[in-house]
Amino acid sequence: MQCYSEDENDFSDWEKAGAEGWGWKNVLASYNALENHISKKENYGNGPICVSDLSEQMHPFSKHFMAAARELNWPKPNNTAISSEGLGYVHNTTRNGKRFSSADAFLHPAKKRKNLHIIKNAIVEKLIINNSQSDGIIYEVNNVKKCAYANKEIILSAGAIGSPQLLQLSGIGPEEILKKAGVKLVHHLPEVGQGLQDHLAITKYFMTNERTLNSDIGNFVGKVTAGLRYLLTKSGPLSVPVNQTSGFVRSSVKSIVPDLQIYANPIIYSTNNNGKTYVGKKSGFLLSAQPSRFSSRGSINIQSSDVNIPPLINPNSLHTKYDKLMAIKACQMIQTIAATKAMESVTKKACDPNFSKFDNDALLNNFRELASTVYHPCCTCRMGLSPSDSVINSRLQVHGIKKLRVVDASSFPN
């Protein structure tokens, strides 16, 4: 539900990578047409997607994160500005205390259209390709195989894992990969499923004597109270996201652009014997950091012609020297925030007391051991100029196949 103003440099990078027309000015115009920002101070934008400023509803403990940011001379992000650099209260895609998704904005209002047919619980198995043109799809619903044909275009929006999987299952992709999986080659497009990128974050927990979300919803009475408050008034801890303060910062004064993302949340989690995570009863907070611009590239490739067999995913994380350095800097940033007077004054103890003393080698090993995905996979059908190093052009059309586009995060160049 988090909604950030992107950095204009991100889209400059996209244009340099061959995504013509995806520069900041063009994308900003699209953002303005998509979003409707709601706050007590000001409203702007006329788009269908609601973006709410919930800063006044955030947990009181979060003010300590803001104080730490001021201590480190970080700016306070302005969500109307070009740059979201700094640490601030997160704006969210909510309305009246409820999640407001892209489906709420676009799909639900269109359900009554005569030219829209929604088929639920269906699995698309492959595309129907004839003479280098996508004519339809083969799908299964209720154990019955069916076909659907397109007069104009087919748009894949199955995500950074599903879209390259479907292309490869349809015979579009690297010849050797398809051959091993037993899929007949229709169109050799070597970068389908290649170039996978994702964000990895490391998180550290700290105990505190002050009240946090653990105090509010970490016990039975608190959960019932919060639930009733939400049902009756659409307010309280269940009406705002757990991720309350976040932003983008520079790992050093030499950094040209913000290259780390910080999350600071008034909550900690515990794990039971079955490995299930839950909100602990004792008050605590977490500090999390992730490098924003990893350079390593992985892959997603099918291992069978059966759509029900998951593809092989190789993240190839921390493969480059730069990524290893940034992993260390992410850990160092958590050390820096934790050492501010603002955070030390409310910290009872660190759950990992040795972390503050780790040298660079120990920090890298700690990142390798504990970092986890932030679920931002992308780039597996990336935009570009040439079929030799990309899958689609800047209009999201698949190289060499007519009437076929890919419209999801797999299209990101980086």
What are these regions (language model features)?
Residues 25, 105, 122, 152-153, ...:
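Structural detector for helix-capping/boundary residues
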Residues 28, 34-82, 89, 209-212, ...:
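FAD-dependent oxidoreductase catalytic-site/capping-region signature
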Residues 1-15, 171:
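Periplasmic solute-binding protein
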Residues 1-5, 153-157, 165, 382, ...:
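Conserved, well-structured core segments
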Residues 23-24, 76-79, 120, 175-179, ...:
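Acidic/polar loop patches that form or flank catalytic/metal-binding clefts of enzymes
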Residues 30, 127, 135-229, 233-237:
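Glycine-rich loop(s) and the adjacent beta-strand/alpha-helix scaffold that form part
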